[in-house]
Amino acid sequence: MGIFDFFKSSEKKEKEKEKETAGSGNNNAAKNAQIRRQIYDIANNESEMMENGNYSDDFTEVSYYDDFGKEFKMPKKDWLEKKLYPSIRKNWNNMDGLYPIIQDAFSKGVYTEVKEAVLRFYAADENFERKMILLGTYHTKTGAYQNALELYEKNLNIDNITEGLCIAYAEVLELCGKVPEAERKYYDALEINPNSATAFKKYFDIVKRRNVKEYESKLEKLSEISGNWRAKMMRAMVFFKKGDKESGNFFLINALKESGYNSEVMYITSSIYILNELYDEFKQYVLAYYNPEKHNAYTALNVLKYYKVRNLYKEGLELCKFTSKFPWIEHYKKFMYYEDYFWKMKVNSESLNNDERASNHFFSTDKPIWYYEFNHPEFMLNQSRRIKPNVLILTFTSIGEKSELAENLAVSLPLYLNENLHYKTNLNYQLAVAYNKESLFVSKKRYSIDYMKLIRQQNNNLNFVLAGNILKMPNVEKYEIEIYLYDTFNEQKSTLVNKIYDENNIYSVQNDLLKAVSTFFERDFSIKYERNLHNLILFSPKLKFLIQSKIHKEHQSWRYKKLLSDQIDIVLEDRNNDLKKINLLALLYEIKQTNSQLLKFQKPIIYSMNIHGIFETQTLKILAPIIFKIYDDDVNFQANIEALNITDSNYLSWINRFSEE
């Protein structure tokens, strides 16, 4: 029984359509109806928009995020009508709900369209500081500086002033050209909180523009007050810029102590020590108090720099692995660099994998690569009998200018073809990918006729060799890609793809390849056209993990982290593609074996995807229970297995393998 027959025989599970809950009570129905009418008037009054010069602005694109945090874009007018206004109406009587909606609109440069919501919020919110700053911000962003000024002048007094209100008031004063008054208000904010980042910067920016000596004098006075760690930190930076490391270090140490070794001061101190090569001080005053749970990614990277200088590869690898559990994906390249660096140190120091004469090997398959790390689910394979012609698929060559993308495509394109040929055809083929030690091997030279003849001599029944060349053109993001079939009997070459792609259309090479193969072999299989490279370029790193040792995988945390993040994005942008979802589940299980620390951060989105039915297709619903096994959620795992009520022995045997570990 093949995957298709098995899925057809599974019981269909009816989906319950979620019903939208009704809004809050009808106590203020008449009032709310009038308010909604005002919002509709704002949305639909096109003549008013045209008079204000905002009509064409409706067709600019606005970014928004769905329930999974996936970014989408739509015309501003559509966003207003479909997203913003419905959200405002829903939260009209809920100030804690209305506040982030208005803030989000402000972040998108949307102001006049939320005027009624701002006024409503100001009238109803019980948080004085919050509503004052919101209305003041609205006036400021719409150019009504005088209105903002009057708002603060009339409502602020010694009894209700706060740090935030002082700063907001001062910012308006600056915009109105009243710099001396703004300076005093920023100072008032510092008297409330001497370590306020915004007030400190804006106050001293004004002072420094006026006179550098005055800046240093006032900084000195503030730094002498106990508890003013920000002033001490800034004064330390002044000393270091002047080359006075001793005085600078004195103030850094005190800033660290007074701040409780907080994240900001630890980052600044560690950066200064690394920049000035003060490694003993780094060890004594940073490393001794460093806590990756408390301190930020920048401090972690500085600690890794220190480990690199001191050749502490064990500590470096340990920190890379530990920090991979944090949501610092934007720093993945830097952490990957250190992982690779420390791994190479480990290999060299411990004489691991040091056979310099190791020859190339071949990973040979006609199965999708996720199969191997997913407990070999035979029932998920296409069990159709394979028939001639017999085809060998080779890794493509990467020639011309050195290119990371070209080398990736040289491996990823054959792997992508492999996955499609396996499920969509009965073609008898075999993919062979060369590797050396734990690295994929991509030839820098075209395959010769003699090489093709040698392959034929070793495979008497072989009909075709499918190969290709990816040439990165010099000094431009263009790629000349040739993919061909070599007829081993007639010793003739048939071109499948021969085209120059640029960075905007190179994604289409995968579509062109499938079309050409389908036409040549007269298989006429369905093609799911891709619109980007996101999915394609993940094949190469997945295979690289497959050929690596377990101990190496354990120290590839950041590569796994990036791969998992990308795979989730791929599923969310193509939610009807079951193969991409299977790849995600297989990757989650693979990660559990060597880097389980990565799973916790992604658990909410994985569970949410399951709740929203992304894994509820005929194919995926029998795999979804594995999610709960991966997260050690035995209650939900057993409940899902019982609900499926599948008695097929192949499936049950596979499921049991996850419990045997």
Predicted feature locations:
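TPR-adjacent "capping" and linker segments in tetratricopeptide-repeat scaffold/adaptor proteins
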Residues: L80-G97, F121-D125, E220-I225, L381-R386, ...
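Register position in tetratricopeptide repeats
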Residues: S107, K141-T142, L175-C176, K208-R210, ...
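Short beta-strand->alpha-helix linker/helix-N-cap micro-motif
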Residues: R386-N459, N463-N475, S494
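Catalytic-center loop of serine/cysteine hydrolases
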Residues: L440-L546
